[in-house]
Curated annotation (Swiss-Prot):
Biological process according to GO: cell division; negative regulation of division septum assembly
Coiled coil (residue ranges): 117-144
GO molecular function: DNA-binding transcription factor activity; transcription cis-regulatory region binding
Entry's Gene Ontology cellular component terms: bacterial nucleoid; cytoplasm
Subcellular location: Cytoplasm, Nucleoid
Encoding gene (name): slmA
Function, in words: Required for nucleoid occlusion (NO) phenomenon, which prevents Z-ring formation and cell division over the nucleoid. Acts as a DNA-associated cell division inhibitor that binds simultaneously chromosomal DNA and FtsZ, and disrupts the assembly of FtsZ polymers. SlmA-DNA-binding sequences (SBS) are dispersed on non-Ter regions of the chromosome, preventing FtsZ polymerization at these regions.
Protein name: Nucleoid occlusion factor SlmA
InterPro entries assigned: DNA-bd_HTH_TetR-type_CS, Homeodomain-like_sf, HTH-type_TetR-like_transc_reg, HTH_TetR, NO_SlmA, SlmA-like_C, Tet_transcr_reg_TetR-rel_C_sf
Length: 198
């Protein structure tokens, strides 16, 4: 029984990995059909549906992975780091690095892979970015409490600026067919971003 569950879980993971790889390839700029995905995995479409009731559920699983990966690591940064600037830098670098290491998933983060899918999926990505922006806003607000001095610019504006930078770099990565990596020249870019945090 345990072997059957493990085999089923492994097949589910194989399907999700194939979908992520297809999103990373030139297929990712077009609608991915279950027929193409089944061919990529080497199974029938019916076999896909034994593991996932719909393609939407496959995307849901990938979005869950993205959410868990980013939010868990952001929470670790907040737990381990106390300096506001360091926290912000590490969160931004985390988002950019995650996108760079997972090009197919970056197509989901930017919405490119979801254009042909249910609107609900884009809504989940929007919620994820709202959560990240709320985390950034909280870090910015805590500066006054932690360091005795806050920012002169509204924290809402600063948080949205940081997130817009991340989204822009991820979009550039996708638009360039993954040529321009989001973390390229990050050490030179960060002082420009940090200078806006006043």
């Amino acid at each position: 029984m345990a072997e059957k569950q493990t085999a089923k879980r492994n097949r589910r993971e194989e399907i999700l990995q194939s979908l992520a790889l297809m999103l990373e390839s030139s297929d990712g700029s077009q609608r991915i059909t279950t027929a193409k995905l089944a061919a990529s995995v080497g199974v029938s479409e019916a076999a896909l549906y034994r593991h996932f009731p719909s393609k939407t559920r496959m995307f849901d699983s990938l979005i869950e992975f993205i959410e868990d990966s980013l939010i868990t690591r952001i929470n670790l940064i907040l737990k381990d780091e106390k300096d506001t600037s360091t926290r912000l830098r590490l969160i931004v670098l985390l988002i950019l690095g995650f996108g760079e290491r997972n090009p197919g998933l970056t197509r989901i983060l930017t919405g490119h892979a979801l254009m042909f899918e249910q609107d609900r999926l884009q809504g989940r990505i929007n919620q994820l970015f709202e959560r990240i922006e709320a985390q950034l806003r909280q870090v910015l607000r805590e500066k006054r409490m932690r360091e005795g001095e806050g920012y002169t610019t509204d924290e809402n504006l600063l948080a949205s600026q940081l997130l817009a930078f991340c989204e822009g770099m991820l979009s550039r990565f996708v638009r360039s067919e993954f040529k321009y990596r989001p973390t390229d020249d990050f050490d030179a870019r960060w002082p420009l971003i940090a200078a806006q945090l006043q």
